[in-house]
Amino acid sequence: MSSSKQPAGYHTVTPALVVRDANAAIDFYRRAFGASEGSRMAGPDGKIMHAEIRIGDSLIMLGEENEQWGTKSPLLTNGNPGSLHIYVDDADAAFDRALKAGATVKYPLEDAFWGDRYGKVADPFGHEWGLATRVKDLTDAEMKKAADEWMAKATAPA
């Protein structure tokens, strides 16, 4: 008997997404982010109540929105309170791949002040994904200076 408090392959924090049309979402995540599918479990109504995909070394659980279970997707609630962040070898290629798969731009790619080549896309299911490649490691002092400069520009009157 295992003494581990978490299943093999899981991390301490494992995201779980609620989507409308889990089959289409799994296909999108495969095309956009290179996800591989793990398990898939359907409920009595045939909708996916639990599925697992893997993007890189990270496991993500997902299931269909279902008001009876109290699970609502961002499409049902008309909003999304968070996002997922993926570090990739080439942010430009990953961004392009996601757009070709059907994602939309939320934040264009740029060389961000924190040292990443970074942009954000929204998937067709309402979830947002940050795509990044680390291009420069910064000290805490360099990070603070860069953040202060960025915020001064962002809040300056037009």
Language-model-detected regions and their locations in the chain:
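Short acidic-aromatic low-complexity motifs
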Residues: 19-23
